[in-house]
Amino acid sequence: MTSPKRPTIARIWRGRTTRERADEYEIYNYEVGIRPLLAIALGVQTFREDRADESEFMTISYWEDVAAMSRFTGSDPTRIHHLPRDPEFLIELPQAVQILRLLTSHGAMG
């Protein structure tokens, strides 16, 4: 019996939208961006912080290793997959993602 794959890499994407469009973007981002990601990443978390004039969205996806992440992004693991309507929703298009090694994980998640 093989043990389940464990994430060693976290890929963090951030984007900002106006407060007026935040609810609409949250639905769009889930349907068009997160759902497909769920099929290939080991895990996905999404976050939203509402501020006075804008809302920030953050997606953290978890990967077995850089090679697995690269199969999703192409040869460059830092490459961003802009969704077709991101220019309409986002205040500015993100230019980079953050990639971190996952050292430990504690507690229940998911």
PLM feature segments, named:
Residues 1-7, 42-58, 81-110:
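Glycine-rich beta-strand-turn "strand-cap" elements at beta-sheet edges
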Residues 2-21:
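An N-terminal domain-start capping segment
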Residues 19, 65, 101-104:
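Non-catalytic surface loops within mature trypsin-like serine protease
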